Amino acid sequence: MSSLISFIFLFLFSSITASAQNTFYLYHNCSVTTTFSSNSTYSTNLKTLLSSLSSLNASSYSTGFQTATAGQAPDRVTGLFLCRVDVSSEVCRSCVTFAVNETLTRCPKDKEGVFYYEQCLLRYSNRNIVATLNTDGGMFMQSARNPLSVKQDQFRDLVLTPMNLAAVEAARSFKKWAVRKIDLNASQSLYGMVRCTPDLREQDCLDCLKIGINQVTYDKIGGRILLPSCASRYDNYAFYNESNVGTPQDSSPRPGKGGNSSVIIIAVVVPITVLFLLLVAVFSVRAKNKRTLNEKEPVAEDGNDITTAGSLQFDFKAIEAATNCFLPINKLGQGGFGEVYKGTLSSGLQVAVKRLSKTSGQGEKEFENEVVVVAKLQHRNLVKLLGYCLEGEEKILVYEFVPNKSLDHFLFDSTMKMKLDWTRRYKIIGGIARGILYLHQDSRLTIIHRDLKAGNILLDDDMNPKIADFGMARIFGMDQTEAMTRRVVGTYGYMSPEYAMYGQFSMKSDVYSFGVLVLEIISGMKNSSLYQMDESVGNLVTYTWRLWSNGSPSELVDPSFGDNYQTSEITRCIHIALLCVQEDAEDRPTMSSIVQMLTTSLIALAEPRPPGFFFRSKQEQAGPSIDSSTHCSVDEASITRVTPR
């Protein structure tokens, strides 16, 4: 949001309810760059527009949303109002009328204005604002109350997932509205609400809500963000009228009154009885197998809550037994968020146990994310999640055991790399490409990995690659193509420019990482190693681009191959990698195109453009160079506040 005003504001919530007749002003924003004179045609059209919005018939207010226009270009005015779904038509009309009467006082000479009230929103502009996403000039408001009985880092995790789920629900609904009740513990609950103007496309609504939800810090009880096209809010009381919106998800049904009470009692009692019987059956089975781990490969249900993967849960004592109490000799390695141990279950099945560090950057949100994401994935080039353990401060993931460690263990060791000839490496490149394609396109979800690197590619007995470490993965909604984040996580050197610098990521971000990975596989060199040896060379991407430009790409080839490779095949892979690391994300190919390029030599390849993070020599420099490389096997996480476009 290029003009987002972000500050802390103490809420005056004590006397506000969803059914209040008194309109409560929140905020407004005027466009000071476009103004009109009091006697102009635009002024006349604006007054006509506002009058029409405040004098509609009763049925028009019952819908809660109306648009209107007045005049002809260049003095045409477009306007709309949006009332909350849970308010009555009379409250809606009262709010719109009140807002109309205040517009010329708050924005007397401005051609554009947006006015936020507790019960409604009013907008007008000299541009077409109907069915057009606008996230400029918003307001972030937050209470000063700390979460009660909940740690702040846990509080964000508890709130963020339900709010994101509500955003997806709202985007897909006709009214573009959704609410959630979030249970913190037995005595505390939060209530969430998200909404968009109903004229928005599903994807525009979801993008708007994601921007707003991600701007909220979630470190206080109570917060909201107001944007022209959408809004979101959470607080520890029901600030909306529950009876007018239905029972929010995760809350218990409330009995009704009058003639419908019998129907409601039946509707409540019968499901509860069935649920009780199911629970009895489940607990009976679990009691019988209390000391036995579930060692079968589970199938997770659809949904983004960790509870849907309940059958994946392991007992901590059983994991301790499998790893000999995490004996150091069983330690396989250490990743960005904790240590990985080899374990053997009581059935004899070997597993890899990822024990997250208590001080690691991966909190419960990332932990839950990795469980939910990986549990849904079934592909030969993705590591299988067998289960998890969440007890006290322990957060543990149990994966299939992949015996040959990670790709970087072979690539960057002068002795071990001899085990990877070009034929094996070419198969590894193809396997990684197919795994990413599955994540992006062929699975039930659209998943952006965000941390593809050699250390996260595991190799099985036959040296087949398996993509691992989904803690930073993001699930995209239907038709979503890109997203923004304030928290840039991953490994510099593998990050695309738009992600590292602006927090913008998409499938093309993974494509960039794949390109870097291919260059490392071909050369046997780390992307960052060249900079450590010679700052003028920069990184592997820069070095490759210079070789390509000079017509000598074969100099990149790992000398350990000898003459055992096809020049045309390896040159084509370098060409594909350079297409993947182009600076502009739109220029990079999709993973489906990449797989076709790798398998069919008849497909003509476009000429690559200069890559992102290109280190220019003194002769090449047209400006300062950018150094974003770091050691490729260490996660360097950072926090970045971005300004979404």
UniProtKB/Swiss-Prot annotation:
Full protein name: Cysteine-rich receptor-like protein kinase 19
Family: Belongs to the protein kinase superfamily. Ser/Thr protein kinase family. CRK subfamily.
MF terms (GO), sorted A to Z: ATP binding; protein serine kinase activity; protein serine/threonine kinase activity
Biased composition range(s): Polar residues: 620-632
Active site (catalytic residues): D451 (proton acceptor)
Species this protein is from: Arabidopsis thaliana
Assembly and interaction partners: Interacts with MWL1.
Ranges of residues in domain Protein kinase: 326-603
Residues binding ATP: L332, G333, Q334, G335, G336, F337, G338, E339, V340, K354
Gene name per UniProt: CRK19
Annotated region described as Disordered, given as residue ranges: 616-645
Topology Extracellular: residue spans: 21-262
Annotated membrane topology: Single-pass membrane protein
